From Swiss-Prot:
One of its GO terms (cellular component) is cytoplasm. The active site is at D9 (proton acceptor), D131 (proton donor). GO terms for molecular function: 1-(5-phosphoribosyl)-5-[(5-phosphoribosylamino)methylideneamino]imidazole-4-carboxamide isomerase activity. Its EC number is 5.3.1.16. It catalyses: 1-(5-phospho-beta-D-ribosyl)-5-[(5-phospho-beta-D-ribosylamino)methylideneamino]imidazole-4-carboxamide = 5-[(5-phospho-1-deoxy-D-ribulos-1-ylimino)methylamino]-1-(5-phospho-beta-D-ribosyl)imidazole-4-carboxamide. Belongs to the HisA/HisF family. This is 1-(5-phosphoribosyl)-5-[(5-phosphoribosylamino)methylideneamino] imidazole-4-carboxamide isomerase. SUPFAM superfamilies: Ribulose-phoshate binding barrel. It comes from the Bacteria. It comes from Staphylococcus aureus (strain MRSA252). It is found in: Cytoplasm.
Length: 234
């Protein structure tokens, strides 16, 4: 069964969503982060909660650590955190604060030896966020281009014991126009590492289609704030 990971994106300790990762598209969510934690925690089908420090991602170092630490105390659900994590000490601080999994992006993409070291130090607890526009990987809060191809890069990761690859199609993110099923399916076939889909998810039918592609988990952003998404789920 595909896992459901609702997302909480933070700017200044406020729950927001961006469209295509553009910081000038910031939209405040109807629920606060605390309210979202309480809401998502009532569902058995929610396997973990996905929290992103958006300013941390842009500034290249964690900004919301103390606030996220306070959110951790509000639920027994597993929590994963990403955004600006660039050092082993930051990872250790999050784990010491009770965070279950850490997501690395830019640092892990630009320094795969460091990624390998972190993955071996914390096996199964490090996830790699790979954000792409089409097949072109972007870094530093999606604001910087790379020369890396999504599929070529992912194939290099096969011997690194990360928990999974969180794949975001930037063109779909925040639009609720449906995931990029074609690229997601190709990515699942290109690697033995679990693939987590993020970006554009609208409703349970999208989740079912992702499940049919053998996607390990789905991160739900804007749709998670709509009661209709949760209808019939326990």
């Amino acid at each position: 069964m595909i896992e459901l990971w609702p997302a909480i994106d933070l700017i200044g300790s406020t729950s927001v969503r961006l469209t295509e990762g553009k910081y000038d598209s910031e939209e405040k969510m109807s629920r606060s982060a605390e309210e979202s934690i309480a809401y998502y925690s009532q569902f058995e089908c929610v396997n973990r909660i996905h929290i992103v420090d958006l300013i941390g991602a842009k500034a290249q170092h964690a900004r919301e650590f103390d606030y996220i630490k306070s959110l951790r105390r509000l639920t027994t659900k597993d929590i994963e955190v990403g955004g600006g994590i660039r050092t082993k000490s930051q990872i250790m601080d999050y784990f010491a604060a009770g965070i279950n999994y850490c997501i690395v992006g830019t640092k892990g993409i630009q320094d795969t030896e460091w990624l390998k070291e972190m993955a071996h130090t914390f096996p199964g607890r490090i996830y790699l966020s790979v954000d792409a526009y089409g097949e072109d990987i972007k870094v530093n809060g999606w604001e910087e281009d790379t020369e890396l191809n999504l599929f070529s890069f992912v194939k290099q990761l096969s011997d690194i014991p990360i928990g999974g690859i969180i794949y975001t199609d930037i063109a779909k993110d925040g639009k609720m126009s449906g995931p990029n099923f074609e690229l997601t399916g190709q990515l699942v076939k290109a690697t033995t590492i679990p693939v987590i889909a993020s970006g554009g998810i609208r409703h349970q039918q999208d989740i079912q289609r992702l499940a049919s592609l053998n996607v390990h988990a789905a991160i739900i952003g804007k749709a998670a704030h709509q009661a209709s998404f949760w209808e019939g789920l326990k």
